[in-house]
Regions:
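Exposed substrate/partner-binding surface patches
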Residues: 43-186
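Papain-like cysteine protease catalytic cores
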Residues: 1-55
Length: 186
């Protein structure tokens, strides 16, 4: 099978590339934890994992990327969960990010919703600059991209064309599927 055959979307392509290119995987991979804590006896269970992208599903139109991260990390109650230790029902679950990667990729998981995003993103005191926006509409893919540091021109990469834009022509689009940020070394 040819490399990349059977890849259906940008998320699958990123997974494929990280699997084949360890250097890319190392740049994108970050550590996370899911913690469940019993609301009765305070027993807790934490599962460590790692990811190559942060999936976002905005709950409201034009919710910001930062707000979706806060939502994902906000503890929430699971009423039907049964504690292993005390057998009571009810727990609090929380998603935590342990480390942030050099390349931070956000994957839009919902269709027909949009998220607001900015050219600079600050998370946990780390500053990231947007360098690529992968878009999809009606079976057609295209990408906005630029060289870093910020201030360089944006380009549109389409099936047949590459179009140059000025550095101020920021690629705002409701067709975004991936946002790619690079950590700035300041």
């Amino acid at each position: 099978m040819p490399a990349g055959e059977g890849i259906g979307d940008s998320h699958e392509l990123l997974e494929f590339l990280c699997d084949k290119l360890p250097v890319l995987d190392k740049l994108c991979r970050f550590k996370v934890a899911n913690t469940i804590k019993c609301n009765s006896c305070e027993y807790s269970d934490t599962k460590m994992d790692s990811m190559i992208e942060f999936s976002i599903a905005p709950r409201t139109k034009k919710q910001s990327v930062s707000e979706t991260i806060v939502d994902a990390a906000t503890p929430f109650v699971l009423g039907d969960w049964t504690c292993e230790k005390c057998k009571n029902k009810g727990c609090t679950k929380q998603f935590l990010v342990g480390t942030f990667p050099q390349l931070l990729v956000f994957h839009m998981t919902t269709v027909n919703t949009s998220v607001s995003y900015t050219p600079i993103l600050v998370l946990n005191g780390l500053k990231y600059a947007l360098f690529a926006v992968v878009c999809f509409n009606g079976g057609h893919w295209w990408t906005y991209g630029r060289d870093l540091p910020p201030g360089n021109d944006w380009f549109t990469f389409d099936d047949k064309n590459v179009q140059s834009h000025g550095p101020q022509q920021f690629p705002l689009t409701e067709n975004m599927r991936l946002l790619m940020y690079s950590r700035l070394n300041e």
